[in-house]
């Protein structure tokens, strides 16, 4: 994979904690991947973050993915923040697994994480669209007042588990219109038409 030029793209894989032994992972410099997202529920947070530290030691950018963020109370989230600060992952992301987050709850979790995490850790949001909040919540995330990098996930046509995710074509248009980005919407729509619509 050494000849694969990623240019400005970060290629990231995902591991559901407990399903992939570390022995199955090559060092990052021998892999096509730049980073790995590790997803886990709160009852596994201690051992999952320890696993994340070992993945990071292999050279990967590690994303600590908090599945079902709405299941965390404040004390549990503070515990997670301490665990994350100890290993300094590339990012910590809120995963709204059932699309339950309303604006107030989203901002509550965001600012708890923003206040507690070390400044070099990016803060992300992975939406699900059960209550049609995915795109709106991504917009709220982008408006949050923070000095750290903010990551918002989206997929072509919003395809994803259950009700799906935030549609990347909408998010890209929003970023172009309000954040001076230059995403090629026609390329996204071409990918949608050529690869996705046949299965919908």
Model-assigned labels for residue ranges:
Residues 1-200:
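Catalytic cores and adjacent flexible loops of soluble metabolic enzymes
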């Amino acid at each position: 994979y050494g000849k694969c030029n990623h240019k400005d793209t970060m290629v990231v894989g995902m591991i559901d904690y407990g399903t992939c032994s570390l022995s199955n992972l090559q060092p990052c410099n021998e892999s096509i991947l730049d980073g790995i997202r590790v997803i886990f529920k709160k009852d596994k947070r201690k051992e999952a973050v320890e696993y994340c530290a070992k993945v990071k030691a292999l050279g990967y950018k590690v994303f600590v993915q908090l599945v079902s963020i709405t299941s965390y109370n404040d004390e549990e989230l503070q515990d997670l923040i301490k665990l994350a600060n100890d290993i300094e992952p590339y990012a910590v992301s809120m995963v709204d697994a059932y699309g339950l987050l309303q604006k107030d709850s989203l901002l509550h979790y965001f600012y708890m994480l923003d206040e507690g995490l070390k400044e070099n850790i990016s803060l992300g949001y992975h939406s699900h669209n059960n209550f049609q909040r995915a795109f709106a919540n991504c917009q709220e995330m982008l408006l949050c007042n923070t000095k750290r990098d903010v990551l918002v996930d989206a997929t072509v046509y919003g395809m994803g588990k259950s009700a799906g995710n935030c549609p990347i074509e909408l998010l890209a248009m929003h970023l172009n219109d309000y954040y001076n980005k230059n995403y090629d919407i026609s390329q996204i729509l071409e990918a949608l038409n050529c690869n996705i619509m046949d299965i919908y």
